């Protein structure tokens, strides 16, 4: 049984963080922190992990698979799952912050294809562990739906599907929609002007599409070029019904589970099942990506924490890390000496001098409605297990929760001077109102239903929008997920475990291994650039609505966002 801080009022405080924390069945009273004082040598470990989110916990999990005898200590300032890992949009997707095209430009085509396969496999691997360990986290693998609601967005959808087909990994399919909110099928035959503009968006982790993790939504390799069908798998001459997800009694495994002794290979993508309709206002078509599962993120991260504790890992909460070096982690409650140190702080790394400019803490906010009746969900057409988004530039993402709410989020909150992170920044009445308007516009059926929860939090954005994992001189790092961390953290944990233990693995040769993003510029350049970029993203959507052409603003800013 874990020890807790007696008399601590943390349970109520932490339940107020999000819908997910409010509905997790755990006691959120913090685990005991390190028992010492600053500068005192308190503990020894083989591996000390800085950060009690999914990156740190997945790393601990796979380390215990490879070597159960390892002494592993996790150090967390608040509670396990306090940050983006527990607050995101609940998309366990195959999205990666850098698009497939960007990966190819930087690392070559073969490396880009291997990275895409690794991400698709990761969705199945998370599902395998959830089932094997009995983690009750509302897992349902229904895929994600990305709606095209204008001719420009339809061109983007076609291009994304064609690009995915060219890489041969992601099994995206494009469908016209039948339903009360769908546009007339003749619109699908309209051809917008050709353009060389390329657009790709990402889902996110605090609001996971969280970059589609739920903060964020989009698909890797999303691009809008010509309106021609070149490479698209289907002609859209008439409405088609959309494939519904399979009913899953347990997460479906795409390949064999990992073993500690043999080299691991990357598997194949998945497919989907039977027909039904989707109703959304003004929607022309939808792209279905099967490589995504709906999840309750706080249940996942809290459940994973219990699993690693059962395996002998020690978690110290209420333990603020001040700094680290090879062989030692310094905290406000004493020092831990360790053979290897894992730094897994994501956006919160911006609060420490050593990593202040490594990532930019970008806020993503969410709302959740009261539960909707089954009859309303029938008219909406979103099934359990499906996540959803559309092709706008200012990202939105959502899911139907296990208790029949809309959980819906997006970008729009400004960057704060000096990369500061404060509880007050988790909430913005302006952004919350924008999210409710966006949800009601997308699904008018949601309009009469009250919003019961509002929350947000920072995710970590590297300067080149390219996540990375490193292990050098006894210090391992992982992060820069830009909201795609709900799944990418699992790949990071597996990869770091292999790097730290020296296990034979295909994962340690993936393109993101050893990648180091450049630092962000100092202020005021960082403040000006981040907020001007945010404004340009919103203007890009307005530009496309007015001109019915791909946005020039989006084209000009695309290289700054990993596309």
How should these model regions be labeled?
Residues 490-509:
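Internal hydrophobic alpha-helix adjacent to the cofactor/substrate pocket in enzyme cavities
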Residues 1-47, 65-66, 70-71:
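Extreme N-terminal leader/targeting segments of oxidoreductases
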Residues 162-165, 281-339:
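Helical element adjacent to the flavin cofactor pocket in flavoenzyme catalytic cores
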Residues 110, 114-123, 148-156, 287-306, ...:
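Short beta-strand to alpha-helix junction loop
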Residues 133-140, 321-323, 335-375, 379-473, ...:
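Active-site substrate-recognition segment that forms the wall
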Residues 36, 136-146, 178-193, 270-303:
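Helix-loop-beta segment of a Rossmann-like dinucleotide-binding subdomain
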Residues 64-87:
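Glycine-rich FAD pyrophosphate-binding loop
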Residues 95-179, 226-229, 235-244, 250, ...:
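Dinucleotide-binding Rossmann-like beta1-alpha1 core, especially the glycine-rich loop
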